[in-house]
Amino acid sequence: MKKLPNIHLAILLLTVMGLTSCSTGPQKIIVGEDACSFCRMSIADNRFGAEIITKKGKVYKFDDTHCLTGFGESNTIKNEDIKAIYLVDFNAPHDLIPSEQIFLLKSPQLRSPMGGNIAAFSSEQQYKAASATFTGEQMTMEGIWK
């Protein structure tokens, strides 16, 4: 009879682990701790990160749009298996913006970790302010994700 409480504890732990692993939203990118899912390097700059979340809830993290697009071109996962793509807000590095709501600026002056040199902004106003500082061109998600 002493084994019964251990079984209950094991079931409880498995349930809690299962519920916490089912998060379908973006996960905070931890600089210096998380590794890029494409190049496997440690994520070094919190202003340029990105994430792909699959329909099954798996999260892929990237240190730059260059790695995000490289991962897409690698066909590691099919486009139809992707639930959402998020990019880090350049002005609020801990915020992840859904790809449908972003304004992208490409500029060599941005100097992103892997040379993608693309920053995401959550509003057109923020994009315009940044484009006054960083000479570059406006990009679209469709233009970088094929």
Segments from the language model and where they lie:
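Mature extracytoplasmic domains of secretory-pathway proteins
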Residues: 61-97, 104
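C-terminal partner/receptor-binding element of secreted or periplasmic proteins
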Residues: 120-146
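C-terminal motif of bacterial Sec signal peptides marking the signal peptidase cleavage site
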Residues: 18-21
